Structure formats: structure tokens, C-alpha cells
Amino acid sequence: MASTSSSRASSSSSSSSTPSIPRTITYDVFLSFRGEDTRFNFTDHLYSALGRRGIRTFRDDKLRRGEAIAPELLKAIEESRSSVIVFSENYARSRWCLDELVKIMECHKDKKDPGHAVFPIFYHVDPSHVRKQEGSFGEAFAGYGENLKDKIPRWRTALTEAANLSGWPLQDGYESNQIKEITDSIFRRLKCKRLDAGANLVGIDSHVKEMIWRLHMESSDVRMVGMYGVGGIGKTTIAKVIYNELSREFEYMSFLENIREKFNTQGVSPLQNQLLDDILKGEGSQNINSVAHGASMIKDILSSKIVFIVLDDVDDQSQLEYLLRHREWLGEGSRVIITTRNKHVLDVQKVDDLYEVKGLNFEEACELFSLYAFEQNLPKSDYRNLSHRVVGYCQGLPLALKVLGCLLLKKTIPEWESELRKLDREPEAEILSVLKRSYDGLGRTEKSIFLDVACFFKGEDRDFVSKILDACDFHAEIGIKNLNDKCLITLQYNRIRMHDLIQQMGWEIVREKFPDEPNKWSRLWDTCDFERALTAYKGIKRVETISLDLSKLKRVCSNSNAFAKMTRLRLLKVQSSLDIDFEPEYIDADDKVELYDVVMKNASKMRLGRGFKFPSYELRYLRWDGYPLDFLPSNFDGGKLVELHLKCSNIKQLRLGNKDLEMLKVIDLSYSRKLSQMSEFSSMPNLERLFLRGCVSLIDIHPSVGNMKKLTTLSLKSCKKLKNLPDSIGDLESLEILDLAYCSKFEKFPEKGGNMKSLTELDLQNTAIKDLPDSIGDLESLKYLDLSDCSKFEKFPEKGGNMKSLRELDLRNTAIKDLPDSIRDLESLERLYLSYCSKFEKFPEKGGNMKSLMELDLQNTAIKDLPDSIGDLESLKYLDLSNCSKFEKFPEKGGNMKSLTELFLENTAIKDLPDSIGDLESLVSLNLSDCSKFEKFPEKGGNMKSLNWLYLNNTAIKDLPDSIGDLESLMRLYLSNSSKFEKLPEKVGNMKSLELLDLRNTAIKDLPDSIGDLEPLEKLSLSNCPKFEVLPLSLKAIDAHLCTSKEDLSRLLWLCHRNWLKSTTEEFDRWQLSAFIPESSGIPEWITYQNLGSEVTEKLPINWCEDPDFPGFVLSCLYRPSDYSSAYNFCHDFKCELNLHGNGFTFTDECSHSCWCDCHVNFKDSRDLVCVYWYPKTAIPEEDHHKYTHINASFTHRFEGHPFFCEDIKKIKCGINVIFLGDQRNHMPMLEHPQNSGDNGSALQDANGNVHGANQDDEHYHIPTLGLLGNFHDNGSAVLEDTLGNRKRRRDDSLPDVVEEPHYKKIGSHPTPISCFELHHQYQSEQNHMW
């Protein structure tokens, strides 16, 4: 434990005397040591061991310089209960250490506040040398001068006194054993009020902080906090750590452990005695005559004191009745923690706050397991996959991780594999016994619900489960709540979840009496057990639920008679490999056929003869995917059936017997291709949902369908032969959803369909319907009407305007030409889609009356203009007129749409915009791309204060008005392919939010000086601008592909990188530098560590983490794409996994680089690519630096948009280099300055036009990235990125003929610059847009 909390003064208004306030104790141990001797070996290991025992230890990790000891160290010594002094060879050479020692011994001898213990450790030194200041200690004192004559006597006295104390002389032997002995001894001597929370307290700090926060230690009120969770999750351990953490703040404390067990075996009296004894500290205890007398004593004594009490493992309210009935029993300022598996106990107790303890995350679980299985904090490499299997099996349960870790310690890989196979069938007894306690406390019905969930319902919707269990008379609502309160299940998004180990416990309970006779079990869930049960001579008589996955059947099952004896069967689920959903529209017809074939192939494994029978009179739920017979069994009795699911079955006609099916709520026969007709529906009056999707042979629906007064959903989607519905459909007074989509022969909606007063959704998309009856207007509850892709639908009914509740009307891709005036009466309409209605020419004049309309999609229509009334659409947010090639003029009153946020005019015939466009105060995105006639952006366009995105790509625009600078919220400005665009206004520098400026393929020649004022600007694209003469240096990204500028790009790169390396630590943390270099000659020799293939591992330099001149690593990989990858312009996604490890610790991170650059497509002779990453040291947690000794880099690559990693991308070679600043340690070849002036020269020009030579800056920075980039031979043009200065340079400014600089600053030895270079922000979401 390393967490601390501030002290709190205790007070009580009801106490007869105010309790004394002890000195503030923040740490258990202050660790004094000589850093250069032991910091990274013995002391570090000792510090970690103390932490694992829950001993709060202060260690000064700073490399301090100076004469006086820091005040925070003196304070830390005073606030520590003890000190551990590591006397090493050079300890006395540090005046700082000696001052610490003097302070420590003063605290040790302080009579006013005794108790500061001192534990000396003599690390490879003779204790007598310390005591007498001889040997290295004598030599140290001999070197001190007269100026220290006042301190030397105190130093000597402190050394002598400390050396006279009992300690540990360490000379030879295993340090791990010695450290264990020391930590155990310190723990025993410090424990006092402290409890042993155990070793290896991984992941506990966050729980402790959460609980302490909930205790509100600063408050003077009484607070009770409940902590609940499944058994073995660590509640008791957390409570002990909190108890130890807060022990210094309370004079009166008690920890009552394992109350449930003690209460059940001994009663409450011993617990009352222990509580009083703890509070009174063994003094003045009185005999308790009865439980009631004990309760009275507790109330009288506690009410006058400020106490801290932990009541551990309470599982029933009766256990609190006579221990702590009410908060009024406690003095003000008291704190109580109650741990339990039963959340209901906490609700009844009315605690102030609740905290649910969740399992460890994967990394924490892996560490905890490794500490027990390998006695280190990560798995051994050979055991990594097996370890991950165990960690996955335990699902973050600390108890299971500890038990299995101990079980597998020092076992071989074959032994591990054997144990894991055993665990699949037989849970470890110690884990099982802990988890089973919660089950043992359940009632009979709750136990049945629990086993049903474990064996059948896990992961299902709560409402569905409740409905089925209620039909079994199990009182599901209260039962599920109790299981949730007792942490046996959890509810997430209304689904019932269960920990895998708890589920396995449920399975074990079912198997308990007859472990090897599955035919006698009450529930079957495993395919192998089902196969064994079918072969049993006496059949399966006791089974209540069967859940069977057909894909896991190893052989064909043909014992049809086995079902005949299942007289208790309540729940039957025979499913395919997946719960296949044929509905998503992205699944094409061929794939749906393939999915159907998968179901039928699996279904064929269960062969049923024509004489198949089973007594179904107890059956509540039946699901059988691919049911193989034409009819249900002749003796089928569905009298208690609630849901019937026969997807993909061979059923031709559904016959459910002669009984009334009053309990039946759901029938799903979807994709039963042979189903041609349904029997009468009169016998199922309470049916609520009927699914007949994909029943391609179904011709009609029986007229009795109108008798189902409670039917809410009727899905007939993709019933290809269905032509119409009976008029009785209008009698479905409760119907809410009617789905007829993709019924390709359905031509006419019934006239009486308007009687369905509850209908809210009507889906007719992709049908043969031509029109709708006027009665459609009577659907007063209809909210959603979809007629999209009805190619024959020509006219929307006049009375359609009566649908007052309609919110969405989808008429996309229909033959509709116009809309009736009554459309204005759709007062609730929010979304109107008319896109791809190629005959639609005119929006109704009175359409502006639709005050609720928020989205209007008119793209790809024949519309020419919009009426002025469009401005009256006060709620409109989205207007799309894209690809309306005849649309020429935006209405003047369009500026009245005050809510409009997105306006798409892409590829229209529009020439200009009215000035009123500036009145669109809410507009966020304006798209005018591909408007080839658009020439002038309106002067008042600068009034759109909310505009973030402006697309002017491929327009005829020549310039922008000065008012563009007033777009203070604009973040993206796209002008690419506007070939006439020549100049940006000077006021563009006022756009303080601009992040991206795309000027590709324009006629622009230069940028205004104000471009340097755009601080947020991160990307500038200037590729293929043949007239461009100036490059700025104020950006994070520049795309200069195919520019004709003869800039010295190497010099530019050096300036960019120098500025970047000079940036703050915070900036290093936020940015990741990477480069993509096509047409490369390979990884240069100065990258020290290289290896063939995609992975490289090397040892780190000694003390790498302490060197202030070491900023990070260069990681590089040489790729060779295949012909396939070079033929297509996919986005290349390069990744590097970085792994630092050593001393049993590991750190992993990932670098990535995505590039749309298509340079590689055009390279004919060589296509090798190099990806380079610059990884800063500051990205590695500083407190862990010293732990790592090796670095490993692993490289991968794929094409973005492809679902697979490309195996044909070869990783030829990779490398790592450790880089330094300010010296010559790397000795890497750097770029040289060009020897010629003129066009090959370079200079800098600042914002005022002053020219600076290339030797202007003489700061000594060693730029390894430039060396790396400059040593690749490249033939392409350039992409430059990451510049931080606000300067620009001209191509025609030359350098002096002779410029001599230090060799570590020389730049430009190669005649051709790099081809692509990019600086990536780790959080940038649209890095690819400008490509």
C-alpha cells in the first residue's frame, strides 16, 4: 500500500472527555539509504517487499544535490512510525544521509512521543565499523573539513547509537531470503493495531481510495459505508487495508471478522464480547448476562466515543440487530464499514453509501496470478499463453487467481495443461466452497432460478427471463432481485450476467449427486453430457431444462425415443452454432443462403423419426433451430407454452393441437422455407408477437389473424410470394409494428388497414405497392412510415396529412413527382427523405408549415429551386441538396433557418449564395464541393460564427473575402482542386480555430504573413501547386507533394526537428513523431541494433533512465510490399509494439502511422518502404524507469479498410537506436549542407521579411531523426510535417558560399530529400483526411 490520507482531529459532543490526538502518522517506514550504493538493487527490492506486505514506506526517489536536507524529508521522518537504515559502504560519504540519521535518532529518543522504532541493516559493511567509524566510515569522516566541525560530533553519536541497536548484518547469502526475513520481522514488530492483509496486494489501491472517499473523513457526522461483492473478490482484504490505513486516526477501533460463520456457530454473544473488548482495550470489561444486555452495553459505551468499526461478512440483518442496530449507538465522528455478499442487508441498514467491489482488470489479474505461480510479476515467456488462459478463466476473481497460482507453482507445461483440462469439468474445491456459501443461503425457489440462469438463461434479457420463469411459478421479479443483491448475478443493460466461476459452481451443484450419470441430472447444458444421457438405458426422466448447441455435436443423434420420457421438461433450446440473424441489410442474399445452410447442416445432426414424440405439457419455452420434421409431434401439448421458436425449420404447416394456447405469447417461424400456410389463430388469443420473416413459400395469412387482439408485432419481411393481407388485419387493435419490407409481390395495402389505431411503425420498403388508400390517414398513432425503394409508388395520398403523430417519412428512390399540400399538416414530422426520387421536381410551397421538421434530404432529385417558405422551417437542422444538378439558386429567405447546422449543396448548379447565408447562426458545416459554377463566396458569409467545416473543393472560386477571417470557429477549410484559386486574404490569420487548410491543386503562389498567427493550425496541404514559392514553418503538418519549389528541404526538416526537441515535456507526452519513407535504400548503419525479420531485442545502456541527455528511441522497419499492395491506393497502417522489460517487470506501448500517400504506386524499380518512429522517454512512467534492462520492438502492417493483415507484406529488417542530445555519443553520419548556393541554398524569412542565413541558429542540438531521414535515397517529392516556428523561407534565397557548422549540426549530404514525413498527434481522429 502506498496510499495516504490526511489526519483528522477527533471530537465528540456527547463524550465526557475529549480523546487525545496522536501525532500524524503518514508512513509505517522511512527508508534511509545511500542512492548510488543500493537504489536500484537491494533497496528497491526491499521497498517492493514492504509494499507487498501492506507496509506504507517512504522512499526519496529524487536525485538531490545541495547542502541542507530537504524539509519534506524531515517531515516524512516525523510522520513515520519507524525507520529502516541501510548502512552501505558509502553511506557516511553523504552528508544528506548523516543528517537524516541524526533526525531519525532524535525521533527515536523523543520521550514526549515515543514509539519511533529504528531497524538498522548493515549491507556488506561491518557493524563495528559503523559503531566506531572505522573502515570506509572512518575514511569518509577523514575527508570532512573544519567547516563541518559542529555537525561531525552529532553524526558520530547517531552512527554509534544506531549501530548499537538490534539489526541485520548482510554479508553473504540470497538477498531474497534476507529481505523476506526483514519484512516479516518489521511487520510483526509494527503490527500493534494493524491487521495482516496478506501479501501481494495487487490492484487494491483504487478500492481503498474509493472507500476512504466515501467515508468522508473530514465530516464530523456518523457515516456507515457498505461494501459488497461476490465471495473471493477481496472485500475482507480491502477492509483490512483501510483499517490499517485509518488506525492512526482513531483511539477506539474494532474489526469483527467473519461474522456470518461465527454467528451461525457460536451466536452473537462472543461477537459482542469481542467488540467491547476491542473498544475498552481489555480494561473494565463487564460480564454480559444476555444478548439484550450486551446490546445495551454496546450502545451505552459506543455512544460516548469516536470509534472505527469494521463488520466483516454480514449476510443477514439479524446479525446486526444486537451488534450495531442504529447509527444513534455511535458517537459523532464515528465510522463503520460493513462488508457483505448480500446488498439487501445494506439497504435495510440504511448505510450512507454503497461500494461494489469489481474484479481485477486483465493486467492486474495477470500480475497477481504471476506472483503466486512464478513468484514474479509477469508470466514466464513459455507459460504466457497458458497463464492468459488461467487469467481468463478466473475473470478477475482474486481468490481464484491465488488458489490456481499456488496450485500451478513449479509445475511443468504438460502438468499445467492437464490441470486446465481438469478445471473445465471440476472446479477447484477451495474456490467452490467459498462461492457456494451464497448459494446455500438461498430459498428453494431462488435456488431453482439460480440453476436455470447458470444452465440456460445466462446473458439473456431480464424481461424475457422473468416472463418464462413466472410461467414456471418461480416469482421471477423478487427472485432475480435477491440473486442480484447476493452478487450471484449482475444486471447490465437489462441482461442477466453471471461470473463464469459462479456458473461453473451451478453446474457442479447439478452434477453433485450423480456426477457420472447425466441422465439423472435436472439440467443438461453440455453437448457431450447430452450425448451420454441419450444412450442411457433408462432414459432421461428428471431433466427440466436442456440447452444444446448443435454445432458441438460430435456424432449424429438418432434416439428419438429419449424425448418421450422427459415428463418434467420445462425449457428446451436446440440452437445452431450462433444465434444467426438474417436481418441486417448489409448481409447480401448469397450470404443469407450460406447462413441458412449452416443452420440446416447442424440441424441434420439431430435425426428424428416420424414417430417422434415427447410429452410437452410442462414445456414453457421451445426453441429448435432447423427443426427437421414437417409437423410438430402428434402428441404435442402447448397448453403451458409461452414462446415457440422454430427458425429455419422444415415445418410446412403449424399445428399446435386442439387445446387453447392461452399462455402462448411469441411464435417465430422465420426462414422456414417450406411453410405455406398458418392454421387458424383462434386458439392463441394472447399472442403478442408473430415472426414469419423469410417464409418464402407463404402465400397468404389466415383471416382469423384479426382475432389476436393482443398482437403487437407482425413481421412478414421477405415473404416473397405474399401479395396481400386480409381485411381482418384492421381488427388488430393492439398492433404496433407491421413489417412487410422486401415482400416483392405485395401490391396493395388493405383499405381497412387504417383501423389499426395503435400502429406506430409501418415498413413497406422494396414492395410492389403503387399507392396507399386514403384510410392511411386514420393511423393516428403512426410514427414511422417507410416506402423507400418502392419503384412503382407515384403518389402520396392527400389524406396522408392526417397522420398527426408521424415523425419519419421515407420516400427515397420512389417514382413520386410531388407532395400534396396536406403534407404541411404533418405537424410532428421530424425527418423527410426524398433522395434519389429522380422525378421529384418541386417542394410544396406550404411545406414550410412543418414546424417540427429537422432533417430534409433532397439529394439526387430533379428539384430546381426551393420556395421562400423554406425559411419558415424553424427546427430544420439538416438540409441536403447534393447532386441536384438543376438546382441553381438558394432562396434569399433561407437565412431564416436559425436552427440549420448542416447544409449540403455539393455538385449543384449554384453560382453564388445570398447575403442572408450569413444569418445562419447555427450552421456548423457548409459543403459546396464540385459546384463548378460557384465563383464568389459572399462577403457576409463571415457572420456564420458557428461554422466549423467549409468545403469549397473543385469550385470556380478565385479568392475569399476579407470577412472569411471572422469565421472564428472554423476548423477545416477545403479549397483543393479549385484551379483558379490564387490568393488567401491577409485576414485569414484571424481564424483562431483553424486546424486544417487544404490548398492542393490550386493556383496559389504564396501565403500571407498572417498564416503564422494560426496557432491551432496542424495540417497544411499544398501538393501539386506548381506556382507555389513559399513554405511556412508554423505548422504541425505540411503536404508538399509535387510542388516545384527547389527548397533545401533537409534544412527545413532540421529546423522543424530542432524546435520539436526543444519543446516541453508535456509536448513530448502528447506527440508521437513518425515517418513513412517510400523508395528507400534501407535502414542506415548508424541505427545500432538491427535484426532480420520483424522483431528486434537489445539491452538498454546502463543508467539510461538517469541521463538527462537521453530523450528517447528511434525504431525503424524496412518493408517490401507485394505487387497487390502497390497496385491499390489503400491507407497503409504501420504499427510497432514497444516492450521494455527486466527484473520481472514489463511495460508495453504501441506506435502507429497511417499514410494515404500513393508514392509507392508510381515507383517502378523499387518499392521498399521504411517506417520510422521516434519514441520519447517521457512516455514511459518515470517511477518504473530503473526496472527495465531490455527493449523489444515488433512491427506489423496492414491496409486500412481490409479486414485482414496482409501476409504478403514482408518485414525485411528492423532496428532500434538509443539517441542522445548535446554530445557526440551516436557518431551517426548527418546530412551535410549543400555546397552550392543559388537554387540549392536556403535561408529563413521571418514575419517582418528579415532574411536569416542557415547558420543563424547556433544552439547545439543533435538531431538523430534527421540523420535517419537523410540517409535514405529517395526519388519522389516531399511531405513535410511538424514545424513549430512562425517563420517561412523562400526557394530563391541563397546561403553564403561557405557555411561551416559543428559536425553534429551539418545537414543535406544527399541531393534528394525524403518523400514522406509525418508528425502524428496520438489523439488526432482525422489524420488521413488531407491525403
Swiss-Prot record:
A motif (Nuclear localization signal) lies at residues 1287-1291. Changing residue 96 to A: Reduced NAD(+) hydrolase activity. Residues 25-190 form the TIR domain. One of its GO terms (biological process) is NAD catabolic process. InterPro entries: Apaf_helical, C-JID, Disease_R_plants, Leu-rich_rpt_typical-subtyp, LRR_dom_sf, LRR_R13L4/SHOC2-like, NB-ARC, P-loop_NTPase. LRR repeats lie at residues 429-452, 480-509, 540-565, 616-638, 648-673, 684-708, 709-732, 734-756, 757-779, 781-803, 804-826, 828-850, 851-873, 875-897, 898-920, 922-944, 945-967, 969-991, 992-1014, 1017-1040. It catalyses: NAD(+) + H2O = ADP-D-ribose + nicotinamide + H(+); NADP(+) + H2O = ADP-D-ribose 2'-phosphate + nicotinamide + H(+). Its main location: nucleus. Keywords: Cytoplasm, Hydrolase, Leucine-rich repeat, NAD, Nucleus, Plant defense, Repeat. NAD(+) binds at residues 34-39, 66. Its EC number is 3.2.2.6, 3.2.2.-. Changing residue 94 to A: Reduced NAD(+) hydrolase activity. Belongs to the disease resistance TIR-NB-LRR family. The TIR domain mediates NAD(+) hydrolase (NADase) activity. Self-association of TIR domains is required for NADase activity. Disease resistance (R) protein that confers resistance to multiple powdery and downy mildew by promoting cell death. Acts as a NAD(+) hydrolase (NADase): in response to activation, catalyzes cleavage of NAD(+) into ADP-D-ribose (ADPR) and nicotinamide; NAD(+) cleavage triggering a defense system that promotes cell death. Also able to hydrolyze NADP(+), but not other NAD(+)-related molecules. This is Disease resistance protein RUN1. It comes from Vitis rotundifolia.
